[in-house]
Amino acid sequence: MSDPVELLKRAEKKGVPSSGFMKLFSGSDSYKFEEAADLCVQAATIYRLRKELNLAGDSFLKAADYQKKAGNEDEAGNTYVEAYKCFKSGGNSVNAVDSLENAIQIFTHRGQFRRGANFKFELGEILENDLHDYAKAIDCYELAGEWYAQDQSVALSNKCFIKCADLKALDGQYIEASDIYSKLIKSSMGNRLSQWSLKDYFLKKGLCQLAATDAVAAARTLQEGQSEDPNFADSRESNFLKSLIDAVNEGDSEQLSEHCKEFDNFMRLDKWKITILNKIKESIQQQEDDLL
């Protein structure tokens, strides 16, 4: 098996642009850059086989750079994806993000927005789960959702906007999150594939409004859900939201806790809902303290 270090050295020599008289006689340097890129890909493959993934990722980045110099944008985009895979598997999330951003930029400039959306969503997951950069993750999910929507992929678009809304709510952007749930409700009405998610969307929208201390808006959401979605009207989600609104209006945090326990006995509350419900409870308790 070839030595990857030697392959990269050969690539570096191959990838030097022609100058002076040599440039006049040799013409385009594209073929030199293509050969240099091939050598870097060979080195990356060897590193990959050895499970030296960060070195493999670095080699793929060098290959992509030569491919761009050769004018092979499509190949460079694919090579950036390979670099991303290596860095991600090697635990180097920062370099994985950089590589994927370069790939997405190429794909979208080439009009490949569906492919760009796929990787934009993946980018959001890394930013959210590995780097905990929620602001950038929100931007990624939102843009991916828009690109999927342009491609008429409603289910995938909704998946992105749900992630976006959930993160906005956890970041305290309750009104913005509520607005996104409104869009999800609108896009899901009459759609047989996503209409079963409506109950959860109405509940989440109402929870965000309660967390924003706007019980009046939450009551409107409850009424809207009961009138527009027959499945929501008599559902546990509807009854739960009504009970929460009543508890907030009465300023009774203990009553709110009881309603949460009752609901949890039938339908397990997920981490997101528990976090938002705790925020609502804290708001009630703050009001109770202010009265003392």
Curated annotation (Swiss-Prot):
Q: Which Pfam families match?
A: SNAP
Ubl conjugation among keywords:
yes
Q: Report the subcellular localization.
A: Membrane
| GO CC term, one of those recorded | cytosol
Record-listed N-acetylserine modification sites: S2
In the UniProt record, does the keyword Acetylation occur? yes
Membrane topology note: Peripheral membrane protein
SUPFAM superfamilies membership: TPR-like
What function does this protein fulfil? SNARE complex protein that binds to cis-SNARE complexes on membranes and is required for vesicular transport between the endoplasmic reticulum and the Golgi apparatus and for homotypic vacuole fusion. During the priming step of membrane fusion, is released from cis-SNARE complexes by SEC18 to establish a pool of unpaired SNAREs, which are required for interactions in trans during docking and fusion steps. Can displace HOPS from SNARE complexes, which may be a prerequisite for trans-SNARE complex disassembly and subsequent rounds of priming, docking and fusion.
Q: What is this protein called?
A: Alpha-soluble NSF attachment protein
Q: Which organism is it from?
A: Saccharomyces cerevisiae (strain ATCC 204508 / S288c)
